[in-house]
Amino acid sequence: MKIRASVRQICDKCRLIRRRGRILVICYNPRHKQRQG
């Protein structure tokens, strides 16, 4: 899980999701997991 100021989709499978006020990127590739912090 990378914690970044600006999250973005890295590949076509990445999905932007909003949970509890945080923006997350989830993907089948675990390297693409990100959270805005």
Swiss-Prot record:
Pfam families: Ribosomal_L36
Domain of life: Eukaryota
Subcellular location as annotated: Plastid
GO biological process entries: translation
InterPro entries listed in its UniProt record: Ribosomal_bL36 (IPR000473), Ribosomal_bL36_sp (IPR035977)
Keywords from the UniProt entry: Plastid, Ribonucleoprotein, Ribosomal protein
Main location: plastid
Cell cycle listed as a keyword: no
Record carries keyword Plastid: yes
GO molecular function: structural constituent of ribosome
Gene Ontology cellular-component annotations: plastid; ribonucleoprotein complex; ribosome
PANTHER family: 50S RIBOSOMAL PROTEIN L36, CHLOROPLASTIC, LARGE RIBOSOMAL SUBUNIT PROTEIN BL36C
Family classification: Belongs to the bacterial ribosomal protein bL36 family.
Protein name (Swiss-Prot/TrEMBL): Large ribosomal subunit protein bL36c
Source organism per UniProt: Cuscuta exaltata (Tall dodder)
Annotated gene: rpl36
